[in-house]
Regions:
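N-terminal export and membrane-targeting signals
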Residues: 1-11
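Carbohydrate-active enzyme catalytic cores, enriched for enzymes
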Residues: 253, 281, 285-431, 477, ...
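Aromatic-lined, polymer-binding surfaces characteristic
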Residues: 137-323
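N-terminal low-complexity, Pro/Thr-rich disordered segments
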Residues: 22-85, 348-368, 656
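Core hydrophobic alpha-helical transmembrane segments of single-pass membrane proteins
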Residues: 11-20
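Extreme N-terminal leader/anchor segments
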Residues: 72-123
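CBM-like, beta-strand-rich accessory domains located in the C-terminal region of large
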Residues: 346, 437-656
Length: 656
């Protein structure tokens, strides 16, 4: 593979989602992995791939794979304490996360990762073949070099099991001998550096505790030398102000604290101080364009704060301020179902609460913590989060929640999801994001990041690209919100979307308008949750319902300026060529899920949609009328009524 693909694999190795029981936790990442799938489904660079690190030289490739990676966990189960911790002058072993192996496997030099069979990588004496790559999976190779799989052996050694401690140290020493500084020529060893640094620190602590000594015995001097080498590697190859760079800075601080090297501590603190203002903006938005990575950022910076305080360095006020803002951001980004919005690279997960915060409020479904001060918020970074309430007049889970994306073009862990809407109501997901297909550069990732995987108007006949989307106006009232957005996704093509979100009855109205200099295919897509069965009743109406459920969803294409054609509504599900109609609850599982398309062909299109969740016993009807150039829709949902006004410029509002 060429240098570009090799550099892309650098991120494939470290940006992941871990599976530990039923908990999914995001790993840090620092670079974009945009791809375009070839006809055969194999990955090719699309020109928006990873940016080289400062002074980065070409790195050799690691064999690619069509399998989805399964990296290890790198976040604590609960957030670090919000109150200052005692200064003990030490760096605490951060643990080994979700890829620990039984001690018996460690003693047998056998490594296992993901769902692949265990593989004997050594002789049984700690002599490891560090070039082992039996399954040709970049992440398998990187986690082998991380040494995190030695965690249970290190714990055993710390408890006094000298046989196991000796074997673990033999494996670590073998890595040090077989991978001399600088190991930058090996992508897997390179990208595992920050993880391996922490393992070395944990092993050093296990030696002191297991042998009941206060200073490192001379026979293990190589361990401290290797820690210095790892620190030097991270100094020279810092990833910058990103999640990955922040993790490196914490590990660098750990070396400085452990070896009493104040210059390393200072450099780490300086880098953290620089990174925090990029990682989290003053409004609480992260630079990763992902709600899931927002949760990771919250935990990561809590870990940084604790590490600094425990070893006598002040984290300063900015980290606490930005984390507090991010806590509010994440609370607003939590659906009424109690899960985070799956926006950007994000798996299905619940937020992790911190005592007394707004995040704790949503994590407990309103039972504790502090209720967020806002019901709806518009963030400059390109996020709109809204809800009908916080459970004041109806159960928390029965509120309706939504998200809308706009802003800067896709980067890092973002998707081409501008103008997309997610929506939850009646205790369930109605409009979904595709989720996170993983880090393998294949047709599935290309689709999951594309506009076709989101609830937007797409122009599949045009050569579209990731572009900035402008929020032109926003109106927030007690019973409705409206937004106007615009962009130009392709040369000679403009796209506008007006959105109206109602409370009582809870529903979403959108007006999509596309205009081009030549005939185009326009499709407004509505991605529904898996197991929904869609019945197309006419070119203007479809109904979706999960068998046995107590609610259903009406999807209405209301005639406006144009009469929908005979094939005005089509449904796609579980399609592989081209990919369409799927959902990823996590990177390991893919489920078919229906996509309802509202279709047009021509130089322009005007598609007025209504997405109306109801009880199964309720009916939805509407009438339209035009008065003085204004278009009105009189909607009836069960016994509730609402009148929607469409102004000539497309603005939507509720007038009753």
């Amino acid at each position: 593979m060429g240098t570009t693909v090799a550099l892309t694999l650098v991120c494939v190795l470290v940006c992941g989602i871990a599976f530990a029981g039923a908990v999914f936790v995001l790993m840090p990442g620092a670079r974009d992995r945009g791809t375009t799938a070839s006809a055969g489904g194999s990955p090719t660079p699309d020109g928006r791939g990873p940016q080289p690190r400062p002074n980065q030289s070409p790195a050799p490739s690691v064999p690619s794979s069509t399998e989805e990676p399964l990296p290890g966990v790198d976040t604590p189960a609960t957030p670090p304490p919000s109150t200052p911790v005692a200064n003990t002058g030490t760096y605490e072993c951060p643990g080994f996360s979700g890829i620990q192996l039984p001690v018996s496997m460690v003693l047998d030099d056998t490594f296992a990762w993901g769902d692949d069979p265990p593989y004997k990588v050594g002789t049984g004496s700690g002599d490891i073949n560090w070039r082992s790559d039996p399954y040709r999976k970049p992440s398998w190779y990187m986690w082998l070099h991380s040494l995190r799989w030695l965690g249970n052996g290190i714990h055993a050694g710390q408890r006094g099991d000298r046989k196991t401690l000796t074997h673990v140290l033999a494996i670590i020493h073998d890595w040090v001998q077989d991978n001399p500084y600088s190991w930058k020529g090996d992508v897997g060893a390179w990208e595992a550096t920050m993880h391996r640094t922490n393992v070395l620190l944990c092993a050093r602590q296990a030696v002191l505790t297991g042998l009941r000594v206060s200073s490192l015995p001379a026979q293990y001097a190589w361990l401290d030398k290797s820690l210095v080498d790892h620190a030097q590697f991270m100094i020279v190859n810092w990833s910058g102000p990103s999640n990955h760079g922040t993790d490196e800075s914490i590990a660098l601080f750990g070396v400085g604290c452990t070896l009493k090297r104040p210059e390393l501590k200072k450099l780490a603190v300086d880098r953290l101080t620089q990174a925090i203002t990029t990682a989290i903006d003053p409004q609480g938005s992260t630079n990763e364009q992902s709600v899931g990575y927002g949760m990771f950022n919250y935990l990561l910076w809590g870990r940084a704060t604790t590490a600094l305080q425990r070893c006598g360095s002040s984290p300063g006020p900015v980290i606490a301020q930005r984390r507090a803002a991010l806590s509010e951001w994440l609370a607003l980004a939590t659906k009424s179902t109690g899960e985070l919005q799956q926006v950007g690279d994000a798996v299905r997960q619940k937020p992790t609460g911190a005592a007394g915060t707004a995040l704790d409020y949503v994590a407990s479904l309103g039972k504790r913590g502090t209720k967020p001060s806002k019901r709806v918020a518009v963030f400059d970074a390109g996020y709109i989060f809204g809800r009908t309430g916080w459970g004041e007049t109806r159960p928390f889970a029965q509120e309706s929640t939504y998200s809308i994306r706009y802003g800067a073009a896709r980067r890092l862990h973002g998707h081409d999801d501008h103008m997309s809407i997610t929506y939850s109501s009646h205790g369930r997901d109605v409009l979904i994001d595709p989720g996170h297909s993983g880090y393998q550069l294949d047709k599935w990732q290309a689709w999951s990041k594309s506009p076709a995987a989101h609830n937007v108007m797409t122009i599949p006949s045009a050569d579209t690209a990731a572009v900035e989307t402008r929020l032109l106006r926003a109106s927030i009232t007690p019973t409705w919100e409206s937004y106007s957005l615009a962009d130009s996704p392709a040369p000679g093509v403009t796209r506008k979307r007006d959105v109206l979100v109602l409370k009582d009855p809870d529903l979403v109205i959108t007006l999509d308008r596309g205009q081009a200099t030549s005939n185009q295919r326009y499709e407004t897509l509505w991605h529904l949750a898996p197991e929904q069965k869609v019945t197309v009743q006419s070119p203007t109406a479809a109904v979706a319902m999960k068998p046995g459920d107590k609610s259903k969803t009406y999807l209405l294409q209301i005639p406006y300026q144009q009469q929908p054609p005979a094939d005005g509504i089509t449904v796609v599900q579980g399609q592989q060529d081209p990919v369409q109609g799927w959902y990823y609850p996590d990177i390991f599982h893919r489920q078919s899920a229906p996509v309802v398309k509202f279709n047009r062909t021509g130089t322009n299109a005007a598609i007025l949609s209504a997405v109306v969740p109801t009880a199964t016993t309720e009916a939805v009807t509407y009438k339209t009328r035009t008065v003085s150039g204004m278009f009105f829709v009189d909607l009836t949902v069960g016994a509730r009524k609402a009148t929607i006004r469409v102004l000539p410029d497309g603005r939507l509002s509720r007038i009753s």
